[in-house]
Amino acid sequence: MSTRTPLPTVNERDTENHTSHGDGRQEVTSRTSRSGARCRNSIASCADEQPHIGNYRLLKTIGKGNFAKVKLARHILTGREVAIKIIDKTQLNPTSLQKLFREVRIMKILNHPNIVKLFEVIETEKTLYLIMEYASGGEVFDYLVAHGRMKEKEARSKFRQIVSAVQYCHQKRIVHRDLKAENLLLDADMNIKIADFGFSNEFTVGGKLDTFCGSPPYAAPELFQGKKYDGPEVDVWSLGVILYTLVSGSLPFDGQNLKELRERVLRGKYRIPFYMSTDCENLLKRFLVLNPIKRGTLEQIMKDRWINAGHEEDELKPFVEPELDISDQKRIDIMVGMGYSQEEIQESLSKMKYDEITATYLLLGRKSSELDASDSSSSSNLSLAKVRPSSDLNNSTGQSPHHKVQRSVSSSQKQRRYSDHAGPAIPSVVAYPKRSQTSTADSDLKEDGISSRKSSGSAVGGKGIAPASPMLGNASNPNKADIPERKKSSTVPSSNTASGGMTRRNTYVCSERTTADRHSVIQNGKENSTIPDQRTPVASTHSISSAATPDRIRFPRGTASRSTFHGQPRERRTATYNGPPASPSLSHEATPLSQTRSRGSTNLFSKLTSKLTRRNMSFRFIKRLPTEYERNGRYEGSSRNVSAEQKDENKEAKPRSLRFTWSMKTTSSMDPGDMMREIRKVLDANNCDYEQRERFLLFCVHGDGHAENLVQWEMEVCKLPRLSLNGVRFKRISGTSIAFKNIASKIANELKL
């Protein structure tokens, strides 16, 4: 086994003092001679109440996994929200570390408006921090759960962006290998952001890859057959499954277990819904071709009639990456005001070091989606120069000035400016804080319960993050929205309801044939044609089955045969890295995951939840560890009463306004206070414990403490934008989708609003 060069030793309290090498690793850059004066003026002073990493104030934990967690954070210098993936390197073996740094290297070279952007990499002796773009709109998966299938016009807009981004990866000789609905995120303007490059790899023309990974319902037939492949063709098949899913709301290939699913994929037969257009059907036939040689390429598919319908004068073409704009004087002047010198700015940007300087420059060029329209004209509200209580800082940010939600914009349109290009005009009146040279130690990160509600106000925008990447399991996609799972009796109009509902799939590792000539040698982080990747099982991918009929709800969240799998040549007892979550925002706070193994594909769910670790089986699954509630046998701090002091504090509070009404479960013209009383009444009637976090926000728990039926969720009364109505927002924090649907539907149906 190859060994990686020992990592440089870094003081855990100086996590921001790093510059990056091209291979994704870091070296320490001493800034002690420059830090003194700036630290005195820094907004993140040593007495800062909230924990922070480098220049980022941590708001809350939005995902957890075996070896990593994801935190929602705010960049102190610019006020932009980011997602930080915190990976414990001490739990990874050398092979896993190679894969981790390969993923980082790949993300550094990707620069497309529909791919989640990496801003900064911070490395210490024990920990790797990936600072990434926060996609506040959540997952496409959750959008489909809430709305059912998309109309073809909407699906086309989304799909054009997806094809543009994947084709861009292919032209850079990168294959994603884990394309699925939960790895497609939406930003504040409902544009696609592809996430999770944990399974990605570089390919060469004429070379073959042999790592069998992906989510079974989206996996190409050659992967089920154990054949070697070039690379792009497996992504093309997955795109066909995604297109079918967008248009129909269900999967083209599904089964009660992995064996049945495999048989259906290898047959290549799928049902064409009556409402699907002929052009869309013909396009699917170019994607879902059993013979990979005859499968269409994305360059060919970009010219397809369905893809370009309504865009005749704007035919989808391969994305031309614009030259990086590293000389935006307005941004540079702002950074000089923060305390950076012209020389170090030019040095960092010319080499794209992905250090704190690169991150600050990129973030200054991005639209501030957090700024409230009412604050946008007030320079005093935008000023971050003075140290203020965190609640004041965050409450000055709220809705985006762009109240009108733009539907997806075609990728082939003139690409909007984003991080690496001259970003939107930066108001000259905005005063930015001096840079900070302080950071919290890793020990601060052990605080799992960092609450962002009171500290961040409405800055989070009600959006959370969603799990998807293998290593993090339920803590992988940092960008899941607050969209409740669909109820069994869907309230979505039948004309827009999919024939099959959406259910999340678990991720697992599938072992492959072991041969004597297969060695676990990774050279330069690449995979040889005889070397399969080795990853820990993933823990939260999605499956799609009917949400309307109970007999078809076979796979709740965590079902193994609905999951991302990864080929492995032999048993490994050391922890292997499956890749950190790819996008910067994760929704519910997932509990840590551990590994279990099971041999067959029958009764997968029961084996998944087994508390035993089986090391002699062929398939590996991840099971959920007990939550804090389960370990203690009770919910700490649960209360059904609101203190008088709390009432006084919140007397003037008003419900926050959500930009997206599709995450609302119930709407009413009732007074928000009366709605809260009704909610508490129904929760009491259903034996739910709850804690009032804010005047209009409840943290709820239901179940007897067992992993199978314990559900935690939030209920919040929110104002619907531009309407004289309030709504109740349901957001699942933990528990299976089926258990959440059951209790959420029951409560929603009993509310008299």
Swiss-Prot record:
- Name the source's superkingdom: Eukaryota
Query: What PROSITE patterns does UniProt report for this protein, alphabetically?
Result: KA1 (PS50032), PROTEIN_KINASE_ATP (PS00107), PROTEIN_KINASE_DOM (PS50011), PROTEIN_KINASE_ST (PS00108), UBA (PS50030)
Give GO cellular component annotations, separated by semicolons: cytoplasm; cytosol; dendrite; extracellular exosome; plasma membrane
Keywords carried by this UniProt record: ATP-binding, Cell membrane, Cell projection, Cytoplasm, Disease variant, Kinase, Membrane, Nucleotide-binding, Phosphoprotein, Serine/threonine-protein kinase, Transferase
After translation, the protein is modified as follows: Phosphorylated at Thr-211 by STK11/LKB1 in complex with STE20-related adapter-alpha (STRADA) pseudo kinase and CAB39. Phosphorylation at Thr-564 by PRKCZ/aPKC inhibits the kinase activity.
Tissue specificity remark:
Ubiquitous.
Q: Which CDD domains match?
A: MARK1-3_C, STKc_MARK, UBA_MARK3_4
UniProt-annotated stretches for the region Disordered? 1-36, 370-600, 632-655
Localization annotation: Cell membrane; Cell projection, Dendrite; Cytoplasm
Residues annotated as the enzyme's active site: D178 (proton acceptor)
- Per the record, residues carrying Phosphothreonine are T211, T549, T564
Give residues where Phosphoserine occurs: 42, 368, 374, 376, 380, 383, 400, 419, 469, 540, 543, 583, 598, 601, 643
Q: Which EC number(s) does UniProt give?
A: 2.7.11.1
State one Pfam family annotation. Answer: UBA
- Which catalytic reaction applies to this protein? L-seryl-[protein] + ATP = O-phospho-L-seryl-[protein] + ADP + H(+); L-threonyl-[protein] + ATP = O-phospho-L-threonyl-[protein] + ADP + H(+)
Grouped into one coarse class, the protein's main location is: membrane
Binding-site list for ATP:
I62, G63, K64, G65, N66, F67, A68, K69, V70, K85
Residue stretches of biased makeup (Low complexity): 374-385
InterPro entries in UniProt: KA1/Ssp2_C, KA1_dom, Kinase-like_dom_sf, MARK1-4_cat, Prot_kinase_dom, Protein_kinase_ATP_BS, Ser/Thr_kinase_AS, UBA
Q: Which disease is it linked to?
A: Visual impairment and progressive phthisis bulbi: An autosomal recessive, progressive disease characterized by poor vision at birth and development of bilateral phthisis bulbi by adulthood.
Q: What does this protein do?
A: Serine/threonine-protein kinase. Involved in the specific phosphorylation of microtubule-associated proteins for MAP2 and MAP4. Phosphorylates the microtubule-associated protein MAPT/TAU. Phosphorylates CDC25C on 'Ser-216'. Regulates localization and activity of some histone deacetylases by mediating phosphorylation of HDAC7, promoting subsequent interaction between HDAC7 and 14-3-3 and export from the nucleus. Regulates localization and activity of MITF by mediating its phosphorylation, promoting subsequent interaction between MITF and 14-3-3 and retention in the cytosol.
Quote the PANTHER family the UniProt record gives: MAP/MICROTUBULE AFFINITY-REGULATING KINASE, MAP_MICROTUBULE AFFINITY-REGULATING KINASE 3
**Protein name per Swiss-Prot or TrEMBL:** MAP/microtubule affinity-regulating kinase 3
